[in-house]
Amino acid sequence: MSQGLAERQTGWRGPESFRRQLGGGPSAAGRARRELTALEADLEGPVLDSVRLLVTELVTNAVRHAGAPAVELAVVVGSRRVHVEVANAGGAFAARPREDGDSGWGLVLIDRLSDDWGVADEPGHQRVWFEIERV
């Protein structure tokens, strides 16, 4: 991983399982879920289910709130943790969990279901990451 957020924020240094450019638009979340099928042999069902849900939320946020014309998904499957990053080429959005209203629950789910997560606003894009224990 080239000086990615994982390395800077969490000390994670491991081989990427994959990195994909998903494009933007309403179908980006579906494309992300299809890409995650590549992990079915490597991840336990409940972990993969959580990763799939949280990736869907992050990709949807990137498209809906940041107006991202393109979204990048990167996943590292380690022996103890799964590290996921979603980067958007749009503007930054307020990445704070909100529990009010009918929408805005994506980051609440990230906060509750992941073991760690964070955000980096970088020139030209925003990167949101999370980690889930495999145990």
Identify the meaning behind each predicted range.
Residues 30-56:
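Conserved short strand/loop->alpha-helix "switch" segment adjacent to the catalytic nucleotide/phosphoryl-transfer site
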